[in-house]
Amino acid sequence: MARPYVADIAGGTATVTIQIQASQTLRRWFVSWMNAAAGKIELSTSPTSQIGTAQPDPSVIARLSSGANTTGQAVADVPINLPVKAFQNVYVHCTGAGNLGTSILSS
């Protein structure tokens, strides 16, 4: 059975590594974050962030922008189509001081 993968987004310039436990196709990336500073959040199969690259390579699955609005939380529900294998790593990269949040990947 496919399982969801929940990971905290640390905020600032950071990367979260999510190790996949079984082969499946991830179809949804739900992200919530505190909108504390301008920045970006990126879902990728590469351990190297491509935030700041205008035309990233195909390892970047999705990218979100965060404005400098300090009034609360933002959420995004992004449809994706990402086949993954057991023990493969998927990465969530972020920039923006204080953009703490949660990433949920699911089938």
Label each region the model flagged:
Residues 12, 22, 42-45, 50, ...:
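Low-complexity intrinsically disordered segments
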Residues 6-9, 54-70:
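Solvent-exposed serine/threonine-rich low-complexity stretches and specific carbohydrate-binding patches
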Residues 25-27, 37-39, 88:
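A generic structural signal for short beta-strands and their flanking turns/coil linkers
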Residues 36-58, 102-105:
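Short, surface-exposed beta-strand/strand-loop-strand elements in extracellular ectodomains
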Residues 15-21, 62-97, 105-107:
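Beta-sandwich interaction modules
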Residues 1-25, 30, 34, 93-107:
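C-terminal interaction-tip segments
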Residues 6, 49, 58-60, 81, ...:
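Intrinsically disordered, low-complexity segments enriched in proline/serine/threonine
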